[in-house]
Amino acid sequence: RGDLPKAHNGTEKAKVKLLLSHDPSHWEAQVRREFPDVDVTFSGHTHGAQFGVEIPGFRWSPVQYFYKQWAGLYQQGKQYLYVNRGLGFLGYPGRVGISPEITVVELSRA
């Protein structure tokens, strides 16, 4: 189990704080409340439930009934969460309507 206070210790002088946290529900449960200086959290875990519908302007998956943030970019105030649907699977060895993904994040100085 992770220890966010321990991981966060010593980051006071960092201009930008990026966090990798497997489960996106961790963002609302702890990161946003206790660590408002974390700029971006990167998560996965949901796999988009490996099933859903995704067309321009509409995205649905049954995973949204279990995870408020389940795929893509979310923002609350100055904090961001990005949830990647990943490449793998759990249980059924495939995907229907939810493509696997690899995200490339390019960081640059403002």
Give, region by region, the residue ranges found by the protein language model.
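Soluble catalytic domains of enzymes that build or remodel membrane lipids, polysaccharides, and related
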Residues: 1-110
